[in-house]
Regions:
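Sec-dependent N-terminal signal peptides
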Residues: 4-13
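Boundary at the C-terminal end of the N-terminal hydrophobic targeting segment
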Residues: 17-19
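N-terminal accessory beta-strand-rich subdomains and adjacent acidic, glycine-rich linkers
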Residues: 22-272
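An acidic-aromatic substrate-binding cleft motif
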Residues: 248, 252-305
């Protein structure tokens, strides 16, 4: 009887652990914490110290045949701690970069995973898929909610065709209306308590850039240009899109998707020093890099070379 009771208790504990709905991830210092909740969708909260910065943020990925992140069924949880030194081929800020983070990989039924990394200066996440053949990506879901009414520093183009040269506008998240123009990345948010949250992306391959809009409910949602199919002439060094697909990308079914990363700091200088984009980039695949030298570049059309 005692053995039966003990076996039942062990089974209950095992099922509870595997059926866990909330998964916690902390940065190496423990100051930044991400709480990932699995309900009918994938949600996460972000805390720095004792202050919650973002809550009820929703992520997902829609293909022509799959709704990844809707009613997620967890298969496996993999955790990893990494501490390594990176050496840039052409140093831009530092000759060596410390890459230290804790990782949470959630593998779901249906051939997809979501990977979170927590650094001492921010966090990042991305989707990974293990699907057959080519996939049509219809949309990537991101609903971002700041807890406080933050001051946003935005570049707002007239459309998806942009040279990223628009002047920055400064308005609170409550002032940014759904009818206003969308914003491009990076986006910088200043909290009332002086923290800075910079959102951007890295490792874009065979995939469009992310833009942001107000969702009409006080949050921020992702927007993407559709896949161009036909182009026409538009001036001496530009093309205009004549026809678009009904998807945002056609890409390999087995791949990793762009990183969505967030720098968190209370010191503006750390924004300039930050190297998250480099730390999250793919490893260099060029075997011989001796020919790569930093130097000057010529902009022919501008200086009439």
């Amino acid at each position: 009887m005692k053995k039966q009771f003990l076996l039942s208790a062990v089974l209950c504990l095992s099922l509870t652990a595997f059926g866990q709905k909330v998964h916690q991830l902390a940065s190496p210092s423990g100051n930044i914490r991400i709480s990932v909740e699995l309900t009918d969708q994938i949600q996460y909260d972000v805390t720095q110290g004792n202050q919650t910065l973002m809550d009820n943020c929703v992520i997902g990925l829609e293909t022509a045949n799959h709704q990844l992140g809707i009613h997620p069924k967890l298969n496996k949880v993999v955790r990893q701690n990494v501490n390594e030194e990176l050496t840039p081929i052409v140093p831009l800020k530092f000759s060596t970069i410390t890459n230290r983070y804790n990782q949470l990989l959630l593998k779901f039924k249906g051939g997809y995973s979501v990977e979170f990394r927590a650094f001492d200066d921010g966090f990042a996440y991305r989707f990974l898929t293990d699907l057959k053949g080519e996939q049509e990506i219809m949309n990537e879901i991101l609903r971002l909610n700041f807890v406080d009414d933050c001051l946003l520093h935005l570049q707002q183009p007239d459309g998806f065709k942009t040279s990223y040269e628009e002047e920055y506008r400064h308005q609170t998240s409550s002032e940014w209306k759904n009818s206003n123009r969308m914003a491009l990345l990076p986006l910088l948010a200043s909290t009332p308590k002086g923290d800075k949250i910079l959102m951007s992306e890295t490792n874009l391959t065979d995939y469009p850039a992310m833009f942001l809009k107000n969702d009409g409910q006080g949050g921020i949602t992702a927007v993407f240009p559709r896949l161009p199919l036909e182009f026409g002439e538009d001036g001496d060094r530009s093309l205009k899109i004549l026809k678009e697909a009904n998807c945002i990308a056609r890409t390999a079914g087995k791949r990793s998707y762009p990183w969505r990363y967030f720098v968190i700091t209370d010191d503006d200088r750390k924004l300039i020093e930050n190297t998250l984009s480099y730390r999250l980039a793919e490893k260099n695949v060029i075997e011989n890099t001796s020919w790569i030298k930093p130097g000057l570049a010529s902009w022919e059309w501008r200086n009439a070379a």
